Amino acid sequence: MTYIIFAFAALFEIAGCFAFWAWLKLENPVWWLAPGMVSLALFAWILTLVPSEAAGRTFAAYGGIYILASLLWLWLVESRVPDRYDIGGALICLAGASLILFAPRG
């Protein structure tokens, strides 16, 4: 369930940030900020649904999923194929996020 929450959080965070990017860098109209802000608020709320006692650990584990989702966005939305360094870096980050998420704690 955590991965599903992380996936939705990433979608809303990336979409929200892209709205700001589109306004500032692509010169889209200022009204792009309204759905961007709603999307970022949904991102923040959804991340609170992760069953965890520590916000920082949740955010750190989520970081790996965010990187993977960002590269998917790069490929599917921006039509730019991730290169070997993108993929290698993402794999390293996912390994770290998995360690944070699944480490035995007691």
From Swiss-Prot:
The chain crosses the membrane at residues 4-24, 30-50, 58-78, 86-106. GO terms for cellular component: plasma membrane. This is UPF0060 membrane protein RL1530. Belongs to the UPF0060 family. Its main location: membrane. The keyword Nucleotide-binding does not apply. PANTHER family: UPF0060 MEMBRANE PROTEIN YNFA (PTHR36116:SF1). Keywords: Cell inner membrane, Cell membrane, Membrane, Transmembrane, Transmembrane helix. It is found in: Cell inner membrane. InterPro entries: UPF0060. It is a multi-pass membrane protein.
